[in-house]
Amino acid sequence: MRLITRWIPLANALASTMPVQVVASIENPSLLPTPPMGFNNWARFMCDLNETLFVETTDAMASNGLLEAGYNRINLDDCWMNYDRAENGSLEWNVTKFPRGLPWLGQYVKSKGFNFGIYEDSGNLTCGGYPGSEGYEEIDAETFAAWGIDYLKLDGCNVYPKEGRTLQEEYKYLYGNWHEILSKMQQPLIFSESAPAYFSMTDNLTDWHTVMDWVPEYGELARHSVDILVYSGEGSAWDSIMTNYKFNTLVARYQRPGYYNDPDFLIADHPGLSLDEKRSQFALWASFSAPLIISAHIPDLSSEDLEYLTNQALIAVDQDPLAQQATLASRDGSLDVLTRNLADGSRLVTILNHGSESIETDISLDILGLSTDCTYKAQDLWGGSTQTIKDAIRIKLNTHATAVYKIDTDEKCSQVIPTGLIFNTASGKCLTGTSSSVGSESCNGSKSQIWQIDASGVIRTLSEQSKCLTADGKAISLQECSENNGQKWSYAITGNLKNADTGYCLTNGGGVSACGFETNSQVFGLPAGVHVAL
């Protein structure tokens, strides 16, 4: 088809021909101060998309409470375009699928109160075999601006190294180029990057870590790992959710206002999920302050699905201006306990039963970084009820269910010390301190694996709080706290935990060694609230 649209000259679509300072999104979080919420067709419909689907989805979201709850983005995924570009090099929509065109659809979506997003690929072809953006980045940016697009998901299929670059360097070049182009636009697009996902399933995670290092500099969110299971896919939908959940726990250090880790879509109508499992995905994503992008047949969502998807207390957690990602306070074979701070000074605790049996147990407040000498008010964010707690929270959970509590603190008990697991992200093993010895073991939920890190970088285990993690040469141990440099540690965006005295980095299996570059054995996850050196 011929392109029927109002063209905006590139000089107008971009800010100007004058030099423009390109700033990282994390330096200008006002572009996306909280994670995006909305709809994308891919996990539910894949390439079976058309104008009718998006009109009906828009109408349903405007009337069923989703728009009012904050889901204000309508995003197209792959397969919306023709297999060939126009003679002038521009992309064209498939006129059979979108007879009135994407500019018309964008206007319709916006007339209902939504923003409009689109999909492209950084390589020479999209994952579905349609034209990629490589070599056409500026004309595609111009096209999207003309169509009223304000959100771009840029995939990473069909990328091949050129000019002596490694594959990781090629991705950085392509996504960096898009970042420059988008940053110069009068109205910069929200930029969703899929680059990390293409490095997430290798045994050596150095390239994955490296890509994760640079994506916050270029965009507002990044798909860090494998796709969530699609509606027609084979396998367990719950296992797929758990895979993406676990990947998200590995990258908390990167998240901050203006940049969000993306564990992929909410698959709210997947037939393989129980209601508890659907609610768990939503609660975990909200606790992460992750994007809440629903991929489902919106007009047919049940009242039960709409009820949890519009839970205002959990949406408020997701949209909290701190954007702090919940991290692991404790983990064993059945329970994960996650914590984070909220902007109003309260503490969030999220408890996931990933085991196969129902569980009833107490969650001690000290593993959440709170004092056991204080009394707190804890609000159940599912039901809204409030209870007074001291020492612990009593919870009862069905298999694959998740509880979420907001714990209010008063002035006398407002201090929160970052507390939780220190774990190697490649092996999943937890740093464990017993008596004077320190090593790496399977996570078992014991207090010998739960650490507190104070503002000076001193680290102590909850099981023996008078003893601190100490480096001496290449050995580590628990020694009486004395505030010497061998007991002071710094945490970097690369995941390295570096000792101030030796200059060595914590290494999986026990001990410290010369700091490597993004090596599997030296990348660790730490509790939310620990200072991260950029």
Curated annotation (Swiss-Prot):
Please list the residue ranges annotated as the Ricin B-type lectin domain: 413-534
Tell me the compartments it is located in. Secreted
One GO cellular component term of this record is: extracellular region
Disulfide pattern: 47-79, 127-157, 430-443, 468-481
Q: Active-site positions, per UniProt?
A: 155, 213
EC number(s) of the enzyme?
3.2.1.22
Instruction: Indicate whether Secreted appears among the record's keywords.
Output: yes
| Stated family | Belongs to the glycosyl hydrolase 27 family.
The protein here is known as Probable alpha-galactosidase A
Q: Organism, per UniProt?
A: Aspergillus flavus (strain ATCC 200026 / FGSC A1120 / IAM 13836 / NRRL 3357 / JCM 12722 / SRRC 167)
